[in-house]
Amino acid sequence: GGGGYIGSHIVEKLVKKNINVFILDNLVTGFKRLVNKKATFIKGDIFNTTKVKMIIIKNNIDSIIHLAAYLDVSEAEKYKQKYNQNNIKGTLKLMEACKNSMVRNIIFSSSCSIYGNVIGSVNERKKPNPQGYYAYTKYKGEQIIKKYAKAYNYKYAILRYFNVAGASSSNKIGEIQKSHGHLIKNLAIQSLKKKPQVVIYGDNYDTKDGTCIRDYMHVSDLADIHLKSLDYINKKSKSLVLNCGYGKGYSVLDIV
């Protein structure tokens, strides 16, 4: 997933630290122009277990950052088989490829949506209660990671993202995926007069202005969390489950 929005920001920070990075991306939702030229790019996907295992062994790869997933919440409800195949079975295939190799650290891209409909703040000890199918696929992905970590002595960091926004200060990468649901990106486009209006969905939430409240995190900070988590599990030999947000929510109208 190194050719995607979040993945490209993580890679940018890794190569700045002179870490040898290999990107595996089928570019179905990623973009070749987001692929960092200082990393080794291999076009392919996680379903080709033989190819993935060969890449791991040939290059003595010891850490995997797994970002390959579909992430459209509405689409997931319509095309459950597609999301089951990619997000759940894809994770299973990747873990199979890691067996009996040099891999010792796994970073998994999860989601705060696994908690379900929560009022107020939530910590990592709260029992997951996924409501939608996308959330369910992320929850199952976490279970797969934990199962293989226990069986094959991996260390993992499961990172539960809240809402991600922003772009690298390098001005070379950013959020270019076509999406109707990314509020901050849509407002930026609208403010540049490239879009006639932004439609706000939902005005009857139990909030001060009736619109949904979300915790937004800058993508560069989220990328830093991946690097720090990798460093932690590598040095401490302990696994982690972390919420990734600032702990402060903003309503849709606040953002507007």
What are these model-predicted stretches?
Residues 99, 147-151, 180-191:
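Basic phosphate/pyrophosphate-binding loop/patch that engages nucleotide-derived ligands
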Residues 44, 56, 83, 175-179, ...:
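Pocket-edge positions in alpha/beta enzyme catalytic cores
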